[in-house]
Amino acid sequence: MTLLSTLRGISSPARQQPGTQSESRRGGDTLAERGLAVAGVSHGFDGTAVLESVTLAVDRGETVAIIGPSGTGKTTLLRLLALFSEPDDGTIGLDGTDVWRQSERQRLAARRRIGMVFQKANLFDTTVRRNVRYGLSVRRSWRERLRSWLGGRKRQESVFEALDIVGLADAASQSASSLSGGEAQRVAFARALAYDPDFLLLDEPTSDLDPRNTAVIEEAVDAARSRGLGVAVATHDMHQARRIADRIVVLLDGQVIEAGPTERVFSDPDDARARKFINGELVY
């Protein structure tokens, strides 16, 4: 049974214990032996530092919300977690393995285990169904594509299951160009889910959506997490972060200034700057 076929109507399992740690291969920070992680990561553009010595891990079966002011590095951190580029310093690991010390083929295999939904949905001018199926085509290895081609019915089932999760199964034959912005974002979410990734990264996924579409996305996030995906969400919406996240990471000026269980961070943060940000008192 696939992940997608069991996402709906399943209660959340007990939280997994945090992964153990091993030494990073590039620095003194530790790299989680389970899940998707960064250890001591720094990164910048054109000589300007964006992230400085960031360490965090996303384990399977949990949702981590990354919050902080605009321009503080949330999107850059997600893109590094998605393995879009190599960090200037530090380690990016998948289940304890330094991905950027692997071969290109191994990195491609690792990248296929990670789905990402951007702030703005980028859909093709074709049907909703074909947009979702595109994720299956580009993310799977040639062996997986061959098996999928030989089992076309299973491939179609994956597409419709993903669309059903976001409430758009009835729109499968509809042109993507006719969708509202919220519906397009839901299609992008379905596309990321269709190939059953281990980890899902969301960059401000509901920033421009109405309450109904926001609720659908949040329900889909919770369903994915409840069935074992590790989810990381960058959001400026404090209420959303508190609703959907198991853990909170607060970024300020490219550094993690606070991290911990959601209720503890919101009710009693250790860092004074994090407290001011959460209370809306930080002038930035």
From Swiss-Prot:
Which is an annotated GO molecular function term of this record? ATPase-coupled phosphate ion transmembrane transporter activity
Enzyme Commission no: 7.3.2.1
Q: How does it assemble?
A: The complex is composed of two ATP-binding proteins (PstB), two transmembrane proteins (PstC and PstA) and a solute-binding protein (PstS).
Q: Which CDD domains match?
A: ABC_PstB_phosphate_transporter
In this chain the ABC transporter domain maps to 36-278
Question: Can you list the GO cellular component terms from the UniProt entry?
Answer: plasma membrane
* The name this protein goes by in its record: Phosphate import ATP-binding protein PstB 2
* Membrane topology label: Peripheral membrane protein
Q: Which family does it belong to?
A: Belongs to the ABC transporter superfamily. Phosphate importer (TC 3.A.1.7) family.
Q: Which reaction does it catalyse?
A: phosphate(out) + ATP + H2O = ADP + 2 phosphate(in) + H(+)
- Top-level enzyme category: translocase
